[in-house]
């Protein structure tokens, strides 16, 4: 009996040590990137599942990157972007793409809406780093064009808000309420729930947004794989529970297998 328990203990110890390892940041970044690409229609559910399994398997490889390596890589990239900003690369990019006028410290709003979706990943990352750097400053110390970028990142026509008109003088189409709720402090006004006709379906504002939410659904092949994995996990879980409840059954199974 002891000769069978010994390898089981080793396997249990190895599984415990491996499962206690924290997932590296690269895995989280890759998963976030795949979700974004799947929403844009660039990947289907099956490819997403296969890619996720590959990343999980890479965690157990001897040459896999550690969390410290990931943090060092992110820090180096951040330092590189800040050096680019300090060298004036950001201003040159904004002047070229959005017609930045340094005399009034403003950009063309129309160009911002039209040209921003055409930027490549490196250019967007440079702008995002600049916006994050200025977010800690006092509002009066932030340049006007950086305020424009902050406002665009918060409310502009990009990502899920793609194809929604960007006009600061009008209420956005995806505003939650068609009729705004009044503010009351007298304690006498009755509060009631808004009718469905007074609400906006945020999922069907535009065709582009509707497609984004449709692509998040799992295809039949992925659902089949997922339910199969759940079923196998339940079966093995029940068998493991039965073995733990009846030690004699474990001895019988091992002795019969010899």
Swiss-Prot record:
Its main location: mitochondrion. Residues 1-15 form a transit peptide. GO terms for cellular component: mitochondrial membrane. Coiled coil: none annotated. Signal peptide: none annotated. Keywords: Membrane, Mitochondrion, Transit peptide, Transmembrane, Transmembrane helix. The chain crosses the membrane at residues 221-238. It comes from the Eukaryota. It is a single-pass membrane protein. It is found in: Mitochondrion membrane. Involved in respiratory growth and required for cell survival in the absence of prohibitins. Belongs to the GEP7 family. This is Genetic interactor of prohibitin 7, mitochondrial. The gene is GEP7.
